[in-house]
């Protein structure tokens, strides 16, 4: 249980960092991974059960591969690193299993829990527009048109110099709004650095992952069972 609590604290801290600055400090996932392996060594020695250590190491290795694949796919690097930390910290945790996929993932030395947390987290991304809305409100964005009201859920309003640094795509300004900017919509030359424009959001995946981490011990793979019964 202590591993689960530490994992929850790490994810909450990472979520706050990601929400405020769109950056997750490396010390969080490193601490989770190191503590996970050290605690597994301690538990294996005291309980004379070395499968605990094997699970932690295999969880780290498998989640490292999955996290690297996420990075290559363009998904946030910080989110993949948190997966690595959780793989070493809580590779296994009690949760209900309803599907054949869940049964397959529940094999020995497969980090069932963190993988299911990330799978459920992807489904929880349906709530991300409300996270984006809340962040816009906190940043002082106020819609002046109907289009801007919609953008409160799907874009972010920020100064041009910040958007350039973060390599965002331009969605527009005032009534000239493009809800689906192309990859080359990053010509900021027509704006001054202090102007505020609407740009594409950087998806804070760590927030739905944190929510998933808290509820997955209760729901297991029930979402998969409901949406894709097999």
UniProtKB/Swiss-Prot annotation:
This enzyme's EC code(s): 3.4.23.52
Outcome after substituting residue 25 to A: No effect on proteolytic activity
Cell compartments where the protein resides: Cell membrane
Sequence ranges on the Extracellular membrane side: 19-23, 73-78, 140-204
Signal peptide: none
Residue numbers marked as site, Essential for catalysis: 18, 79
A cellular-component GO term for this protein: plasma membrane
Effect in UniProt of substituting residue 77 to A: No effect on proteolytic activity
Annotated consequence of substituting residue 78 to A: No effect on proteolytic activity
Residue ranges of the TM segments: 2-18, 24-46, 50-72, 79-89, 111-139, 205-216
Pfam families assigned to the protein according to its UniProt record, in alphabetical order: Arc_PepC_II (PF06847), Peptidase_A24 (PF01478)
Membrane topology: Multi-pass membrane protein
Predominant subcellular localization, coarse grouping: membrane
Keyword line: Archaeal flagellum biogenesis, Cell membrane, Hydrolase, Membrane, Protease, Transmembrane, Transmembrane helix
Stretches in topological domain Cytoplasmic: 1, 47-49, 90-110, 217-230
UniProt GO molecular function: aspartic-type endopeptidase activity
Domain of life assignment: Archaea
Purpose of the protein: Cleaves the N-terminal leader peptide from preflagellins.
Family to which this protein belongs: Belongs to the peptidase A24 family. Archaeal preflagellin peptidase subfamily.
Protein name: Preflagellin peptidase
């Amino acid at each position: 249980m202590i591993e689960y609590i530490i994992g929850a604290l790490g994810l909450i801290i990472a979520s706050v960092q990601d929400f405020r600055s769109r950056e997750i400090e490396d010390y969080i996932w490193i601490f989770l991974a190191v503590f996970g392996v050290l605690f597994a060594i301690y538990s294996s020695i005291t309980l004379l059960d070395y499968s605990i250590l094997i699970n932690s190491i295999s969880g780290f290795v498998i989640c490292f591969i999955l996290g690297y694949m996420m990075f290559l796919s363009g998904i946030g690097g910080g989110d993949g690193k948190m997966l690595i930390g959780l793989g070493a910290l809580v590779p296994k945790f009690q949760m209900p299993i309803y599907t054949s996929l869940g049964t397959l993932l529940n094999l020995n030395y497969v980090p069932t829990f963190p993988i299911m947390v990330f799978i459920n987290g992807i489904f929880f991304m349906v709530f991300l527009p409300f996270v984006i809305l809340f962040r816009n409100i906190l940043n002082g964005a106020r819609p002046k048109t109907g289009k801007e009201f919609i953008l409160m859920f799907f874009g972010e309003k920020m100064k041009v110099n910040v958007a350039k640094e973060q390599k965002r795509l331009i969605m527009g300004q005032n009534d000239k709004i493009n809800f689906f900017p192309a990859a080359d919509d990053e010509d900021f030359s027509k704006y001054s650095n202090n102007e505020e424009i609407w740009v594409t959001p950087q998806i804070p995946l760590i927030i739905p992952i944190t929510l998933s981490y808290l509820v997955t011990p209760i729901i297991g793979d029930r979402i998969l069972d409901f949406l894709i019964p097999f």
